[in-house]
Swiss-Prot record:
It catalyses: ATP + H2O = ADP + phosphate + H(+). The lineage of its organism: Eukaryota, Viridiplantae, Streptophyta, Embryophyta, Tracheophyta. eIF4F is a multi-subunit complex, the composition of which varies with external and internal environmental conditions. It is composed of at least EIF4A, EIF4E and EIF4G. Keywords: ATP-binding, Helicase, Hydrolase, Initiation factor, Nucleotide-binding, Protein biosynthesis, RNA-binding. ATP-dependent RNA helicase which is a subunit of the eIF4F complex involved in cap recognition and is required for mRNA binding to ribosome. In the current model of translation initiation, eIF4A unwinds RNA secondary structures in the 5'-UTR of mRNAs which is necessary to allow efficient binding of the small ribosomal subunit, and subsequent scanning for the initiator codon. Residues 72-242 form the Helicase ATP-binding domain. The keyword Acyltransferase does not apply. It comes from Triticum aestivum. Residues 253-414 form the Helicase C-terminal domain. A motif (Q motif) lies at residues 41-69. One of its GO terms (biological process) is cytoplasmic translational initiation. GO terms for cellular component: cytoplasmic stress granule. Pfam families: DEAD, Helicase_C. PANTHER family: ATP-DEPENDENT RNA HELICASE DBP3 (PTHR47958). This is Eukaryotic initiation factor 4A.
Length: 414
C-alpha cells in the first residue's frame, strides 16, 4: 500500500515527522537555503558539451526558459538544487541537461537516478533524456510498475547510465540488487509535491538510505508544500533554491478564459459548439472522474467527434497506445483526468478545456500547463457553472491572474 514503509524499512514516520516539525518551527527555513540568481540567457553561455547542445537544439529549444536560465548551470556544477517552476516551463529538460553534462559515458553503470510519481511521467522523462542525449550516446531506462521486472533486470544487466522510475518499482529493483547503487552520483525527485501527496515518502526515504553517502540531490516541483521542504532538509547539503514565486506562476504565454454554462447539462452542447467553431490542432479535455471520461467520450463519439480517452482504470498497455496515437497526431482530442495531467507532454497541444474545474487550485496549473509548452502560445478554456464560481475565484486569487470571459473572436486566438 502506498505510504506504508516496505518490509525491513528502518523508517520511523512518527519520529521523522516530529523532528521535521521541530526544525520547521525553529524559523530557520530561510537560512537553510541559499538562493541562486545567476542568469544565462543562451544555452551557448552555459558551458555545455557540444553534443549536448546539439541535442538541445534538435529537440526544438531555441532560448532557455526562466527556470533553465537559472537552473541548468548550478546543477551542472554539482550543487544540490531545489527548483520550483510551473508545468510546461522546461523543468524536465533542466535536470536532464544537468545529468547529461555530468555523466561519464565510458562507464556504463547507473550514475543518475530520477524518481517520478507516475508511470507516464517517468516514461516522458526517459524520452526527453534520450532525445537530449542522442548525440552523447546516453543509455537510459524507465523502471515502472505495470511492466516486466524481468525485462528491467535484463536491460539493467546490459548497462545503463540513467534510471528513471516510480518509487515502488525502483525500490524493488534496488532491493533485488538488479540496480547497483555504488556508482550513482545524482539523485533527482521530479514533481516532489505529487510524490509526497501520493504517500511515497517512506519509499523515497528507503531508496535514499541505499544510495552512496556523497550524492548530488535535485528536487524539482511545481508547488513546494511543507512536506517537500521537510524532505529537502533530510536529504540535501547546502542546497541552492531557485524559486519562481507564486506571483510569477502566471502560466505566461497561455491565454485563459471562462465560459458561463449555468448548468452542468449545458456543457456538452457548449463543447460541441466550440469544436465546430475552432480549427484545433490538438487539445486535451479534463474532467474530474473516470466515469465521466467514459461518459463524455461516448457522447462526443455519438456526435461524430473523433476523440480518445485515457484514465487510471485502463491497463498500462492501452494507455501507452492511446498516448502514442495522440503524440503522433493521429488522434487530436484527448479526454482525461487529473491523474494523468503531469504525464502529458505533447508539443502541439494548443488548447486545454477544463470541462470540469479542478477540485484544488494547485491542479489548475498542471492541467493548463499542457498547452503553450516551452513558449508556444496556448489557450485554456474553463467551463463554469454557478457552483464553480467560488473555485474560479480561488484559482484567480491563488495564481494572481484574471481569467476573462471567452470573447466572440476566439477562433483568432488559436
Amino acid at each position: 500500500m502506498a505510504g506504508m514503509a516496505p518490509e525491513g524499512s528502518q523508517f520511523d514516520a512518527k519520529n521523522y515527522d516530529s523532528k521535521m516539525q521541530e526544525l520547521l518551527s525553529q524559523g530557520e527555513t530561510e537560512e537553510f537555503f541559499t538562493s541562486y540568481d545567476e542568469v544565462h540567457e543562451s544555452f551557448d553561455d552555459m558551458g555545455l558539451q557540444e553534443n549536448l547542445l546539439r541535442g538541445i537544439y534538435a529537440y526544438g529549444f531555441e532560448k532557455p526558459s526562466a527556470i533553465q536560465q537559472r537552473g541548468i548551470v548550478p546543477f551542472c556544477k554539482g550543487l544540490d538544487v531545489i527548483q520550483q517552476a510551473q508545468s510546461g516551463t522546461g523543468k524536465t529538460a533542466t535536470f536532464c541537461s544537468g545529468i547529461l553534462q555530468q555523466l561519464d559515458y565510458g562507464l556504463v553503470e547507473c550514475q543518475a537516478l530520477v524518481l517520478a510519481p507516475t508511470r507516464e511521467l517517468a516514461q516522458q522523462i526517459e524520452k526527453v533524456m534520450r532525445a537530449l542525449g542522442d548525440y552523447l550516446g546516453v543509455k537510459v531506462h524507465a523502471c515502472v510498475g505495470g511492466t516486466s521486472v524481468r525485462e528491467d533486470q535484463r536491460i539493467l544487466a546490459s548497462g545503463v547510465h540513467v534510471v528513471v522510475g516510480t518509487p515502488g518499482r525502483v525500490f524493488d529493483i534496488v532491493r533485488r540488487q538488479s540496480l547497483r547503487p555504488d556508482n550513482i552520483k545524482m539523485f533527482v525527485l521530479d514533481e516532489a509535491d505529487e510524490m509526497l501527496s501520493r504517500g511515497f515518502k517512506d519509499q523515497i526515504y528507503d531508496i535514499f538510505q541505499l544510495l552512496p553517502g556523497k550524492i548530488q540531490v535535485g528536487v524539482f516541483s511545481a508547488t513546494m508544500p511543507p512536506e517537500a521542504l521537510e524532505i529537502t532538509r533530510k536529504f540535501m547539503n547546502k542546497p541552492v533554491r531557485i524559486l519562481v514565486k507564486r506571483d510569477e506562476l502566471t502560466l505566461e504565454g497561455i491565454k485563459q478564459f471562462y465560459v458561463n454554462v449555468e448548468k452542468e447539462e449545458w456543457k456538452l452542447d457548449t463543447l460541441c459548439d466550440l469544436y465546430e467553431t475552432l480549427a484545433i490542432t490538438q487539445s486535451v479535455i479534463f474532467v474530474n472522474t473516470r466515469r465521466k471520461v467514459d461518459w463524455l467520450t461516448d457522447k462526443m463519439r455519438g456526435r461524430d467527434h473523433t476523440v480518445s480517452a485515457t484514465h487510471g482504470d485502463m491497463d498500462q498497455n492501452t494507455r501507452d497506445i492511446i498516448m502514442r496515437e495522440f503524440r503522433s497526431g493521429s488522434s487530436r482530442v484527448l479526454i482525461t483526468t487529473d491523474l494523468l495531467a503531469r504525464g502529458i507532454d505533447v508539443q502541439q497541444v494548443s488548447l486545454v478545456i477544463n470541462y470540469d474545474l479542478p477540485t484544488q487550485p494547485e491542479n489548475y496549473q498542471h492541467r493548463i500547463g499542457r498547452s503553450g509548452r516551452f513558449g508556444r502560445k496556448g489557450v485554456a478554456i474553463n467551463f463554469v457553472t454557478r457552483e464553480d464560481e467560488r473555485m474560479l475565484f480561488d484559482i484567480q486569487k491563488f495564481y494572481n491572474v484574471v481569467i476573462e470571459e471567452l470573447p466572440a473572436n476566439v477562433a483568432d486566438l488559436l
